Curated annotation (Swiss-Prot):
Pfam families: Na_H_antiport_1. This is Na(+)/H(+) antiporter NhaA 2. The gene is nhaA2. It is a multi-pass membrane protein. Na(+)/H(+) antiporter that extrudes sodium in exchange for external protons. It catalyses: Na(+)(in) + 2 H(+)(out) = Na(+)(out) + 2 H(+)(in). It comes from Brucella anthropi (strain ATCC 49188 / DSM 6882 / CCUG 24695 / JCM 21032 / LMG 3331 / NBRC 15819 / NCTC 12168 / Alc 37) (Ochrobactrum anthropi).
Amino acid sequence: MAGRIQNTIRNFLDSESSGGLLLIASAAAALLVANSQLSEAYFGALHAYLGPLSVQHWVNDALMAVFFLMVGLEIKREMVDGHLSSWPRRILPGAAAAAGMAVPALVYLAFNLNNGAAHGWAIPAATDIAFALGVISLLGPRVPTSLKVFLAALAIIDDLGAVIVIGLFYTTGVSLMDLGLAAAGVAALVALNLSGVKRLTPYLLLGLVLWFFTYRSGVHATIAGVLLALTIPIKRTPAKPEATVSESPLHLLEHSLIKPVSFIIVPIFGFANAGVSFSGLGMEAFFAPVTMGVAAGLAIGKLVGIFGAVLLLVKTGIVGLPAGASWPQMLGTTLLCGIGFTMSLFISLLAFDDVLLQNEAKIGILIGSLVAGLAGFIVLRFSKRADGRNFSQ
């Protein structure tokens, strides 16, 4: 019996979809708690201070820096040694990601250009890689591997775009002295890389210093995670010429972070930030411009932007559809890109100081992501392959 339970737990942890499922559960739990008799304790705990920061700030500024470290490692690995390692491979997901960020932002601005909430334009521009891949993996072999690769590549480029947006548009009150010290930390990390240092310990220690001064500078501290990731060596250790690329420092660090990030950090973030108390909000909150802009941006803007870009590139002969994929399958995959949970929530906290606007954005994220996720799942579940056969056949 104990062995069977252990095997069940192990299979869950090894499943592609389990991280997304756990994130869904943590978000649902946050919503339930925030609207129960425990709501006061929930919000009180988030705003309680541990040292210099509140619990919510520790989650959003410190734990999420580790999440962004893993995102940065994924970006570098794919650019150097993966699905984005050549320009032809980057064209389709790159163009789709760019359009998939621009169109949702425009949809949001159509609702909020003149009402003081325009600063939230980037909220629906992000795709949640954990959720999207979690949903598509639930369909198993019904979805061709090429589409999973396309979705992963698009989401990674989307994450890179989100990181750039956060750095450029959601940074205020910069301290030049601390920023200079953070830059010195980056220079030291680059020097380690160029010197051929392969041990991870010096990089991680300097990464902590970089995080501290980045946080102090006013630039969002999570950017430190990405900068650290880009300096981690991906080449094999010279002393082990027989070693595979998968034994590089970057791959080893990424592998060690996957489960802690997927099963601890991201669910904690979801639980700490998805809680919206509907008490006193009223139905008008569901139809507020911010709510409508975010929901429409995710559910409609992502679809129009990404599918439109793919359609244009394929019909003009620049690229072809992913191998074995049909247009209905591409449509379903595009819909899944409208799941914008983690990164969208994160940007909403940076965009708005007003709790009411934050709550409206969260409602929009939940509605848009739910509609996009369900629609994408249904379309993919009943789509036919490029050869016309049902996946169930």
